[in-house]
């Protein structure tokens, strides 16, 4: 009986070790993978700037990029794309087997307080895949969701700019500068010295890529990718929001 129990304990321990080693191997592979920066193409009609009110926030299209700001505030945007903002791919064992990095933006649709951006991603195999990126004000922030028409693409990448001298704290911090930082499944992100806060949610491991100066890229599992953007006056406000969102996603 004791021998059976010991065998069971050793079996569980080895299984746990295997999971840890597999996760570490995946993280190592993912951190070496080049980022999914995309090139944005828009039709001539989209050269006209436009603004969309989202509760206490405003999403502005400047003709070449997006900027999310606190409405009526002179503070810099809390999220700004500066060009391509969405990429996707098919990932296996921490490596991208297919990359989709040519992006088109073809429509804005505002229904109630939900703004949807729709377009296509051109992948390395030459095929076009439709996407929908939505912004909706929720609980004092803006929730971002990504939808892809092709279930073959299991990873999405959301990209944005970071201000000069903007320092990060939270799950990632300044020590992550110049690295691709693998985050745990669940809710994770950062608060910055500029008062900009980001939280991402994924049921699988996710990552924040800080290898390129002044730019950030978040990668997550397509089927569960959600993100929240909001202004936070200090790290304590960010931590409180993080805890609330973590509890909400577990319901």
Regions found by a protein language model. Name each.
Residues 29-250:
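Catalytic and substrate-binding clefts that recognize carbohydrates or anionic sugar/phosphate headgroups
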Residues 1-17:
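N-terminal Sec-pathway targeting helices
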């Amino acid at each position: 009986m004791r021998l059976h129990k010991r065998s069971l304990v050793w079996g569980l321990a080895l299984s746990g070790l295997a999971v840890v080693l597999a996760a570490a191997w995946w993280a190592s592979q993912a951190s070496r993978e080049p980022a999914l920066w995309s090139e944005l193409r828009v039709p001539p009609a989209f050269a006209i700037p436009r603004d969309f009110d989202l509760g206490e926030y405003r999403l502005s299209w400047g003709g070449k990029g997006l900027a999310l700001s606190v409405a009526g505030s002179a503070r810099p945007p809390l999220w700004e794309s500066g060009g391509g903002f969405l990429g996707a791919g098919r990932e296996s064992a921490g490596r991208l087997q297919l990359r989709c990095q040519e992006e088109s933006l073809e429509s804005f649709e505002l229904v109630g307080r939900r703004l949807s951006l729709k377009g296509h991603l051109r992948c390395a195999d030459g095929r076009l895949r439709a996407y929908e990126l939505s912004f909706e004000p929720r609980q004092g922030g803006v929730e971002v969701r990504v939808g892809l028409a092709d279930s073959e693409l299991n990873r999405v990448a959301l990209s944005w700019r970071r201000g000069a001298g903007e320092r990060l704290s939270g799950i990632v911090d300044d020590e992550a500068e110049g690295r691709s930082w693998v985050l745990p499944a669940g809710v994770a992100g950062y608060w910055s010295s500029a008062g900009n806060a980001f939280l991402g949610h994924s049921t699988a491991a996710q990552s924040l890529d800080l290898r390129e100066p002044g730019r950030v890229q978040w990668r997550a599992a397509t089927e569960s990718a959600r993100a929240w953007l909001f202004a936070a006056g200090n790290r304590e406000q960010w931590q409180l929001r993080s805890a609330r969102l973590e509890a909400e996603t577990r319901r």
